[in-house]
Amino acid sequence: MKDDFAEEEEVQSFGYKRFGIQEGTQCTKCKNNWALKFSIILLYILCVLLTITIAILGYKVVEKMDNVTGGLETSHRRYTEKLTEVESDLKKLDDQAGQKALNTNTELSSFRSDILALRQQLHDIAEKTTRNKDTLEKLQESGNVLDDRQSQIRSALDSNSFMIISVNKTLQAYTGYINNLQQDTSNIQSDLQNQVHSHNVVIMNLNNLNLTQIQQRNLISVLQKSMEDKSLAILRIKNDFQNLQQVVLQARKDTDWLKEKVQNLQTLAANNSALAKANNDTLEDMNNQLSSFSGQMENISTIAQANEQNLKDLQEQHKEYENRTSAKFNQLEERFQVFETDIVNIISNISYTAHHLRTLTSNLNEVRTTCTDTLSKHSDELIFMNSTLANIRLDSASLKMQQDLMRSRLDVEVANLSVIMEEMKLVDSKHGQLIKNFTILQGPPGPRGPKGDRGPQGPLGPAGLKGQKGEKGEPGPPGPAGEKGPPGPIGPPGEKGGKGSRGSPGSKGQRGSPGKTGLPGPSGDPGPPGPQGKDGPQGPQGPPGFQGLQGTVGEPGVPGPRGLPGLPGVPGLPGPKGPPGPPGPPGPGMPMALQSEPTSVPEANGCSPHWKNYTEKCYYFSIEREIFEEAKLFCEEKASRLVIINNKEEQQWIKRQISGKGSFWIGLTDSEKENEWRWLDGSLPLYTNWKTGQPDNWNHGHGPGEDCAGLIYAGLWNDFYCEDVNNFICEKDMDKEQIFGV
C-alpha cells in the first residue's frame, strides 16, 4: 500500500508541476506529456468510480448483515420458542406419568387391601372349619358313648330274653306236671286226639311262621287257644281239682300279662335280631316239647295211679312255686320298668343327637355353599385383577417405550441444537471479523496488488472454554444376575400393626341346597287296644271225638288278648265275560254331551284340572314335597312320569312356572352308573342347564353321593341326595280326546 501511495505522489508531483504549460519547444515530449495527463485523469476518474462502487457495495453488505442478524435473531427466537414448547411437553408428559403412577399406586393399594380381605376371609373359614372339627369330635365321642350304651342295652336285652326263655321253660314244665295229673284214661285219649289235631294245626302254622311276623303272632294266639282248650278239658275231667285249676288260671293270667309285656318289649325292640332268633328257638323248643308231649301222653295211663299219691305233695309245691313266681314276676316288672326308662332315655338321646346332626349337616351345607360362592367370586375378581394387571403392565411398557422415544428425540434435538449453536457461534465470529474489517476500511481503497506468497502457518490458538455438563444418558440394559449372597441375619420382629378398618359387608350368597333328610325316628309306644273285631269265618269241621263224662260247670275264664288282623287275601281271577245285553230303547235325538252332565269338566287345553299345557304336553307342579322315589311313584300313579327337559324353550317355560317356589325334582339320575346321568326312560340328556360347578356329587366324605337331579332358583340344574325332600314336576302327553270333546 505504501508503494502505491508513493507512486501516486510521484505521479502527482510530476503531473502537477507542469500541467500543459512548458512543453512548446519539444513536440514529442509534449505529446507524451499529454498522454500521461490524460491517463492520469482517467485514473482519477476510475478511482472515483471505484470508491463509489465500493461505498455502494459496503452499503449493500451492511444491509445484508443487518438482514442476517435479523434472521439470526428470529431463528434464535423460534428455537427458544420450540425449546419452551418442548419443555412444556416434557412437563406435561411428566405430569401424566405421575398421574398414571398415582393411579397404579392406588390400584395396587386397593389390590393389596382386597388380598388382605381375602386372607382374612380365608382365616375366618379356617377357624370355622376348626370349630366344626371340634364339634365333630364331640359328636364322635357322643356316638361312641351311645354305641357303648347300645351294647349295654343289647346285653341287658339278651339277659332278659334268656330270663324269658327260662320262665317259658318253667311254665312248660308246670303245664307238663299238670298234664301228668290226669287220671281218666278215656278222657285223656279223646283229649289226645284233639291234641293231635291241634298239633297238626300248629305244625302247619309253624311252616308259615317264617313268612311274616304277623303270622307268627297268629300262631302264638292259636297255641294259647289250644292251651286254654286243654285246660278246659282238664277242668271237665277233674272236678276234684277246681281249686288247683283256679290257681292255674291265675297263673295263666300272669303268663298272659307277662306275654303282653313281652310283646310290648318286642315292639320296642323290633329291630333286635337276637330277640327274633330267640323267639324262633323257643318255638322250635315248643315243637320238640309238643312231640315229646305226644309220647308222654301215651305213658299217662300207666303213670296216673302213681300220680294220685303225689297230688297232695304237688299242691304244696305248687303253692310254694306260686309264691316264688309272684316274687320273680315282681322283680321282672321292676326290671322291665327300669329297662323302659333306660330305653326312653336312649331314644331321647338318639333323637337329640339326630337333630343335632341334622342341624350340623345343614350348617355344613350352608358353609359349603357360602365357600363355593365366595371362592367363585374371588376367582372372578382375581381373573379381573390379573387382566387389569396385564393391562397395567402393557400400559407401563408402552409408557416406557414412549419415554424412551421422547428421550431419544430430545437427545437428537439437543444434539441438533448444540450443532446449530456451534454453527451460529462460528457465524457470529465470522460476522464479527467482517464487521471489524469494515470498520478498518475507512479511506478509499487502493488498487489491488499482486497476490503475495503464502505466509507461514500461525501458532495454534488457546483451548476453548469447557462446555456445560450433558444430560444423563439412557439406562443401559440390565446386567446378568449376580450370585446369591449369604443369608442375612434374622431381623427383629416388627411391631404389631394397628387394627384395620372393617371391610364392607359382602353380597348375599346364593341359596344352598336343602339338607339331607334325617334318620327315621324311633318307634313309638304301642297304642291302646282297638275295638273288638268281628267273628271270623267258621273253621272246618273236625273228626268226632269220644263221648266224655259230664263235668261240672266251671267259672267263666278271663277273656284272652285280641288277635291280630289277618293278611289280606289274594284277589280272585276275573270272571268270564257275560253275554251282551239286549239293545235298549231308542233315545231322543239330542247329542250325548247334552244328555249327561260330566262329573269333572276338563279344561279346554286338553289337560286335567291342576295340570298346565305346553306344546302338546301336560305338566303338574306339585305343592307337596317328597323324596325322589316317592315323587316318581306319585307321577306313575297319575299315569305320567317325572319331567324330561329336551330343549331350551321347555327349560325357559318351566323356569317361569317355578320362579320363587323352591326346588323341584326332574327325571334325571346317575344311580345306575356314577357320573353317567340318564333320564328315567334310559336316554342320555341332549340338553343340559347345570349350575356352574355342578354336578359335584358331594358326599361329605362318607356314604353315597348326590345321585338325583333337580331344579333350583333361576331354573338351574343341581344334584341332590335322593333322600332330600323337594317339590316335583310330572309330565304326560296331552289327552287329545278331551280337546275334541269325546
From Swiss-Prot:
Residues 439-605 are annotated as: Disordered. Residues 1-37 are cytoplasmic. The chain crosses the membrane at residues 38-58. Keywords: Calcium, Coiled coil, Collagen, Disulfide bond, Lectin, Membrane, Metal-binding, Receptor, Repeat, Signal-anchor, Transmembrane, Transmembrane helix. InterPro entries: C-type_lectin-like, C-type_lectin-like/link_sf, C-type_lectin_CS, CD209-like_CTLD, Collagen, CTDL_fold, Oxidative_Scav/Glycosyltrans. Ca(2+) 3 binds at Q694, D696, E706, N718, D719. Disulfide bonds join C607-C618, C635-C730, C708-C722. Residues 614-731 form the C-type lectin domain. PROSITE patterns: C_TYPE_LECTIN_1, C_TYPE_LECTIN_2. Residues 467-526, 527-586 form the Collagen-like domain. One of its GO terms (cellular component) is collagen trimer. Residues 71-101, 271-334 form a coiled coil. Scavenger receptor that displays several functions associated with host defense. Binds to carbohydrates. This is Collectin-12. It comes from Gallus gallus. The lineage of its organism: Eukaryota, Metazoa, Chordata, Craniata, Vertebrata.
